[in-house]
Design a protein with these regions (language model features):
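Class I (Rossmann-like) S-adenosyl-L-methionine-dependent methyltransferase catalytic domain
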Residues: 2-148, 160-193
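A conserved beta-strand element that flanks and buttresses the S-adenosyl-L-methionine
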Residues: 152
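Hydrophobic adenine-recognition pocket in adenosine-nucleotide-binding enzymes
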Residues: 156
Length: 193
């Protein structure tokens, strides 16, 4: 009931008309201070994805998932796979595959994409699933990791609380995954747990 009331207060149509900096601060407040405290992570991230709260026209996964933002990474990943002899990538959270889909076109590796949002998993499976490409609903803070050589965890951890980051890293350490490739966002001077 509280979630419905809060959702009515922060209607997307209202937020979209605000200046960008105010919009992002309101969305951050809404998700980090209100939703994350009262709703399951799956509900929060499903709401973010369905309503395009990141406000990006190219990718529902947000501005960090655009082709421009990932250009260097897309060039570097094949080198990393060769250097570390990676045969299976576990990409979680995988998001909408906006940038990753180009690496999967002629993939010589096995790819497992995991995301907490079931709609994303279903859509990715329909559009990209094949013999060497699988998708699973997955919570990086709670679920046991599948067998893989590399966990790709890009632009995700800073959306979680410090305790959830620790849980994610504990799940990784409990797994047989050899390597982690992750990123963080250090541009937010106002971050609080």
């Amino acid at each position: 009931k509280l979630g419905n009331t809060i959702n009515k207060m922060f209607k997307f149509e209202f937020v979209i008309k605000l200046p960008m900096i105010i919009k992002f601060r309101l969305m951050r407040l809404y998700h980090e201070k209100i939703l994350f405290k009262f709703l399951p992570k799956e509900s929060v991230f499903t709401s973010i994805w369905r309503n395009n709260y990141w406000g990006n026209a190219e990718s529902l996964s947000g501005p960090g998932s655009t082709l421009v933002q990932t250009e260097g990474l897309r060039k570097k990943i094949p080198e990393i796979l060769r250097e570390y002899e990676v045969k299976t990538i576990f990409d979680a959270p995988c998001g909408d595959l906006n940038w990753m889909s180009s690496l999967l076109e002629d993939a010589s590796f096995k790819y497992i994409g995991g995301d907490i949002v079931k709609d994303i998993v279903d859509k990715n499976d329909l559009n990209f699933g094949k013999d060497n490409i699988d998708f699973i609903q997955f919570d990086i803070t709670a679920d046991p990791f599948p067998e893989a050589d590399l966990w790709l965890c890009r632009a995700a951890l800073y959306h979680l609380s410090n305790s959830d980051i620790v849980l994610s890293l504990e799940r990784f350490l409990e797994s047989n995954v050899k390597y982690i490739l992750t990123s963080n966002c250090i541009t937010d001077d106002e971050h609080v747990n």
